[in-house]
């Protein structure tokens, strides 16, 4: 899992990320799974907008109440933010997980935004379930 989750605030009249993208555009593994956990209601223009199928361009908001979350394919689906025209800020946490059988300890790829290599101890931590 992503060692340090991303904390985001999307204030009114602002965006939370720089531009429309797929996470693979920033060196992420095509096998990563995104988690989006809003800490305030996420709706309308104060949330993430994403297409439903890669390349379709049918952008819709990921709307959720506090306590709800999304598991989605941010690696392959183009997504971003619109300018928040609501009068409410959105506060959220997002993070990524990678199935261990898809992990490549020899990768040279690194996170563009964090400058961390996509390896255990740098970008990722390992979750070991207790029996």
Q: Residues of each region from the PLM?
A:
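Long amphipathic N-terminal alpha/beta scaffold segment
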Residues: 1-20
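A structural signal for short, well-ordered beta-strand segments
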Residues: 5, 35, 93-97
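Catalytic core of Fe(II)/2-oxoglutarate
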Residues: 56-131
């Amino acid at each position: 899992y992503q060692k340090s989750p991303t904390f985001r605030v999307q204030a009114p009249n602002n965006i939370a990320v720089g531009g429309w993208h797929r996470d693979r555009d920033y060196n992420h593994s095509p096998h990563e799974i995104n988690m989006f956990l809003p800490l305030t209601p996420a709706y309308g223009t104060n949330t993430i907008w994403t297409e439903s199928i890669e390349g379709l361009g049918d952008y819709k908001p990921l709307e959720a109440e506090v306590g709800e979350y999304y598991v989605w394919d941010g690696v392959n689906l183009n997504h971003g933010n619109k300018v928040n025209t609501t009068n409410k800020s959105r506060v959220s946490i997002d993070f990524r997980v990678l199935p261990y059988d898809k992990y490549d300890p020899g990768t040279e790829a690194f996170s563009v935004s964090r400058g961390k290599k996509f390896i255990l101890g740098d970008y990722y931590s390992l979750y070991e379930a207790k029996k």
